[in-house]
């Protein structure tokens, strides 16, 4: 069918690469590009003899638009799958615009010098992508991504309007370290150290970090503490789902994780303000990232399961409806299949699916879109096929 250029070579990229290689009918060729080409070459060595997909590799600095344009012009992909850093979304989108190439990512843009992420920077590309006749699919990971598709599916099949959405992200995995993050430490710590927020009656309500805590009993995981965070899909779902009065996002954290994080905050290690150290300027959080375990190395030692889903409350034919749709993913099963833990797996599989739907024309439309703006059915079918089966509950325990 076609060729994908995959930018990035971390844990999520590894899953995308494996899944594209499993889906050779659609992805007849992939080029893996990263700042460190040796990482890309490792994937090629591991997979080339096991797949019909042709694999090439390249070196690129994703902060450099000219380098990106040159690479896209050289490789001529049908689509670019961006699994680099969120700071690099706009340079990659600029390169896609210049070369008229479709684009998919898993997380919205945030400036490197400000711990704030929102869609406004990427939504500003709408007219330019439309004019160029190309598609940008934003946030095709799990959350954001599958969570948006879950809500669109609920809206299409079970509701006339959805008034309340709670997105619950539970990681019941244990990697055995006193402190480590399941995805890029810099991005993860910025996210959980920031103020929380949710949308109520069209307005953002801000909370202190970890101020709002709830307990929830997750299927196949058990009772966990979860905390309200700011999360990017709230912004798009509030616009795209009919009838929304309130939308919140909760994520589980262990007491050990929170204690370590608080200690690191107290000594300044989570700061993104540059400091001078032995004549060099360093960012404490970037230094911390360098000494923490690489999330891509956690796969073999992580046991347990994730459970991520959406609880929707609303109305159908004048009657109240409650609906919970979620996926449970086993860390060790993911490792056996693609060599990663479930957090990378649950992000990487939907990135491949989103790219597949754009490439095959099912989700191909000029402009910039979030996942919930397309027909959810082909995506939901693909989740079952490609390793993220989902479960429905029509009588869920609600979050107060």
Q: What is each stretch, according to the model?
A:
Residues 72, 78-82, 103-104:
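N-terminal Rossmann-like NAD(P) cofactor-binding module of classical short-chain dehydrogenase/reductase
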Residues 107-134:
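Rossmann-fold NAD(P)-binding glycine/threonine-rich loop
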Residues 49-64:
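Rossmann-fold cofactor-recognition segment
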Residues 36-39:
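Helix N-cap at the beta1-alpha1 junction of Rossmann-like dinucleotide-binding domains, i.e.
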Residues 156-400:
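C-terminal catalytic/substrate-binding lobe primarily of soluble NAD(P)-dependent oxidoreductases
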Residues 61-77, 88:
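Conserved Rossmann-fold cofactor-binding substructure of NAD(P)-dependent oxidoreductases
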Residues 13-17:
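N-terminal Rossmann-fold NAD(P) dinucleotide-binding loop
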Residues 4-11:
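Conserved N-terminal Rossmann-fold NAD(P)-binding element of oxidoreductases
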């Amino acid at each position: 069918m076609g060729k994908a250029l995959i930018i990035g070579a971390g844990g999520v990229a590894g899953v995308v690469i494996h899944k594209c290689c499993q889906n050779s009918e659609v992805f007849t060729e992939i080029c893996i590009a990263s700042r460190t080409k040796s990482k890309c070459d490792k994937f090629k060595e591991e997979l080339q003899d096991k797949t019909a997909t042709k694999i090439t590799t390249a070196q690129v600095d994703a902060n450099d638009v000219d380098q990106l344009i040159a690479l896209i012009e050289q490789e001529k992909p049908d689509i670019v799958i961006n699994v680099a850093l969120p700071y690099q979304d706009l340079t990659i989108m600029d390169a896609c615009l210049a070369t008229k190439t479709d684009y998919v990512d898993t997380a919205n843009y945030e400036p490197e010098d400000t711990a704030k992420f929102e869609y406004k920077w990427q939504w500003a590309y709408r007219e330019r992508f439309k004019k160029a006749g190309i598609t940008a699919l934003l946030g095709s990971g799990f959350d954001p991504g599958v969570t948006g598709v879950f809500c669109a599916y609920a809206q299409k099949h079970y509701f006339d309007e959805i008034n309340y959405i709670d997105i619950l992200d539970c990681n019941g995995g244990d990697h055995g370290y006193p402190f480590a993050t399941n995805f890029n430490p810099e991005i993860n710590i910025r996210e959980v150290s920031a103020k929380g927020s949710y949308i109520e009656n069209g307005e953002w309500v801000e909370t202190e970090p970890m101020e709002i805590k709830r307990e929830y009993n997750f299927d196949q995981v058990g009772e966990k503490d979860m905390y309200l965070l700011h999360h990017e899909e709230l912004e798009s779902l509030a616009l795209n789902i009919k009838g929304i009065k309130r939308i919140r996002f909760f994520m589980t954290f262990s007491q050990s994780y929170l204690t370590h994080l608080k200690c690191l905050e107290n000594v300044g290690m989570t700061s993104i303000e540059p400091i001078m150290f032995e004549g060099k300027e360093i960012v404490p959080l970037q230094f911390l990232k360098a000494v923490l375990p690489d999330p891509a190395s956690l796969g073999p030692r992580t046991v347990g399961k994730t459970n991520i889903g959406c609880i929707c409350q609303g109305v159908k034919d004048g009657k109240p409806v409650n609906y919970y749709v979620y996926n449970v993913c086993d860390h060790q099963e993911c490792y056996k299949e693609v060599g990663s833990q479930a957090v990378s797996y649950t992000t990487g599989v939907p990135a491949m699916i989103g790219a597949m739907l754009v490439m095959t024309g099912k989700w191909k439309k000029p402009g910039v879109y979030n996942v919930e703006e397309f027909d959810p059915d082909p995506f939901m079918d693909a989740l079952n096929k490609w390793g993220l089966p989902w479960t429905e509950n029509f009588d869920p325990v609600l979050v107060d």
